[in-house]
Amino acid sequence: MRTSKYLLSTLKETPNDAEVVSHQLMLRAGMIRKLASGLYTWLPTGLRVLRKVENIVRQEIDNAGAIETLMPVVQPFELWEETGRSEKMGPELLRFTDRHVRPFVLSPTAEEVITALVRNEVSSYKQLPINLYQIQTKFRDERRPRFGVMRAREFCMMDAYSFDIDKAGLEKSYQAMHDAYCKAFDRMGLEYRPVLADSGAIGGNGSQEFHVLAESGEDLIAFSTESDYAANIEKAEAVAPAVERAAPTQEMTLVDTPNAKTIAELVEQHGIAIEKTVKTLFVKASDAIEAPIVALIIRGDHELNEIKAENLAEVATPLEMATEEEMRELIGAGAGSLGPVGLKLPFIVDRSVAVMSDFGAGANIDGKHYFGINWGRDVELGQVADLRNVVEGDPSPCGKGTLMLKRGIEVGHIFQLGNVYSEAMNCGVLDSNGKNVILEMGCYGIGVSRVVAAAIEQNNDKYGIIWPDALAPFQVAIVPMNMHKSERVQEAAEKLYAELTAMGIEVLFDDRKERPGVMFSDMELIGIPHTIVIGDRSMDEGHFEYKNRRSGEKTPVAMADIVEHIKAQLK
């Protein structure tokens, strides 16, 4: 490809509204342009990368035995009503009506459509297992689109759906897709981790996310220092402390704390160690208990894990904190003064709090706390659960080593759905005994457009993008110095361009009438892995200059050897 016949569209300045590196560089490198909030046009350079991600994903999913199909982006609303997800999805599900006032949605995912398809097309166990996938545009009406294509409203996604006769078959399909994901991300040259995850709105039981590791990642991932255990912060189990609760050494005393509205203020003003404090959080209760509110009690230096809380039978979903008005109506005190002693509401205690002694907590009276609280003596312990986020140094749930935390960008997710959708939509087949059996489903997604942004977050420097070879828009750049003034430079560049392209190598030939500095800057910004510089001075010495984008090293290579040198670099 010649730059003179290509839409390069690079920018010198970083747009003001681009927050993260990938968004900045995708705009500057001429990969995307914003059309509206969360909507982007993919320019030629960006589309070349997107297609490479697509092709790698397609090849590995095909190799796993899945079959490609294509489903409509527009879906009948009635299918979503069958599964009950029409309400669970909330405003992210874009609803509209056609001219006949029939309700439809723009597809954020396709569990309902694929289940309806299999319900109609597959009738016998002899047709199973089957795994169908598509690479298709999706739409989620994000409340706050941000970070470019990382959190856009319209995005490209590979979504696959497996159907099996039993759980053993589902587990086999799930593992095959897990392995296919690993092969795809390995081929892309990305540093990633598969981690245990919560199933969220999709439903089902077993679930893993695939995260590209990057400091800018929105998600926090917990890893064992001595095993392969990995989980996102929502799923990582905070293991119960392996210590006995110490015997009381203090009497419980009521302390005036008029200016201590937070744990930090309590610690600063009264000299109590933060590890000896607890936070009492009031949340809306589910229908499983009679009380309107349930209290969750965690250590003062820990954070509530909302997903773990939502998964408790006693807690309403989605998690909703009680209002100040509700707190006062129930106990006569507000946030900052709540605690377990004398509390007339059901409460659940975190594992780390269950082993505490001589601790401080709100007295359920404004401006007062109890110090020296002990379980059993001053208040009954009651229900204990894992309520908190893990922290670095916690024991690993696998029993090996401790946890370390890193940031990651979720680019893929796999689920063992079970029969959540197939049962709701009566999707079954006749087994070998002629009995109708509801199918076991798995669903699998890769955010294709998100992978592009995640790869940039992991591979960049102050000059621009540093693409892994497998994802680069072009493999090689040819930069001829002052080509329009030197006939032999032009001839050498044209000859090399013809040779490399004839070999199937993707080359960007910069034939613009531009200063060398501009040409070099653009090639580095775009992130082409291998650059060949052709100039009169180097040709006088019988060589071209080869530059590696990742290492930055420049190497003189004999003109006669340059093609073989490039072939060796591309292996």
From Swiss-Prot:
Q: Which InterPro entries does the record match to this protein?
A: aa-tRNA-synt_IIb, aa-tRNA-synth_II, aa-tRNA-synth_II/BPL/LPL, Anticodon-bd, Anticodon-bd_dom_sf, Pro-tRNA-ligase_IIa, Pro-tRNA-synth_IIa_bac-type, Pro-tRNA-Synthase_IIa_type1
Residues passing through the membrane, by range: none
In terms of CDD domains, this protein maps to: ProRS-INS (cd04334), ProRS_anticodon_short (cd00861), ProRS_core_prok (cd00779)
Instruction: Tell me the GO BP annotations in alphabetical order.
Output: prolyl-tRNA aminoacylation
* Stored PROSITE patterns: AA_TRNA_LIGASE_II
Signal peptide positions are none
Q: Which domain of life is it from?
A: Bacteria
**Main subcellular localization, coarse class?**
cytoplasm
The protein's annotated catalytic reaction(s) are:
tRNA(Pro) + L-proline + ATP = L-prolyl-tRNA(Pro) + AMP + diphosphate
Keyword Endoplasmic reticulum on this protein?
A: no
| Cytoplasm recorded as keyword | yes
SUPFAM superfamilies, per database record: Class II aaRS ABD-related, Class II aaRS and biotin synthetases, YbaK/ProRS associated domain
List GO terms (cellular component aspect): cytosol
* EC number in record: 6.1.1.15
Q: Which Gene3D superfamilies match?
A: Anticodon-binding domain (3.40.50.800), Bira Bifunctional Protein, Domain 2 (3.30.930.10), YbaK/aminoacyl-tRNA synthetase-associated domain (3.90.960.10)
The entry's keywords? Aminoacyl-tRNA synthetase, ATP-binding, Cytoplasm, Ligase, Nucleotide-binding, Protein biosynthesis
Entry comment, domain topic: Consists of three domains: the N-terminal catalytic domain, the editing domain and the C-terminal anticodon-binding domain.
According to its UniProt record, which protein family does this protein belong to?
A: Belongs to the class-II aminoacyl-tRNA synthetase family. ProS type 1 subfamily.
What function is annotated for this protein? Catalyzes the attachment of proline to tRNA(Pro) in a two-step reaction: proline is first activated by ATP to form Pro-AMP and then transferred to the acceptor end of tRNA(Pro). As ProRS can inadvertently accommodate and process non-cognate amino acids such as alanine and cysteine, to avoid such errors it has two additional distinct editing activities against alanine. One activity is designated as 'pretransfer' editing and involves the tRNA(Pro)-independent hydrolysis of activated Ala-AMP.
Q: What's the protein name? A: Proline--tRNA ligase
UniProt source species: Vibrio vulnificus (strain CMCP6)
